[in-house]
Amino acid sequence: MKDSTRAKSSKQEKRIAKAIGGRQVVGSGSTPFLKGDVIAGDLFIEAKTKMNPSQSITVKKSWIDKAKEQSLAMRKSDYAIAVSFGDPKDYYLIEDSFMEELLKAREAVKQVQE
């Protein structure tokens, strides 16, 4: 039997939470207070997955706007949209400023390691 949309989404959320050391937000979106699908420290993640394996996914600006708004409401400083093409691999959409911070942090870690 095929997974329901909720079951497929939950699998993705659990996978993301495990990979980044976060937690799945159970019942996300069902209350005015619980938003986002995964929270890891100050990072708010909204997960989007395809039901069946696909070569493409449509990204909507409204997803990004909503994630940004909800992350601020939950007092999270950063947000990302995690997308899956229906397989067990996730890709992340982030703002340019967050990408710049990540690259600077990565370079700083490399400097310390050398």
Question: What is each stretch, according to the model?
Answer:
Residues 1-114:
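Catalytic phosphate/metal-binding cores of nucleic-acid and nucleotide-processing enzymes, i.e., regions
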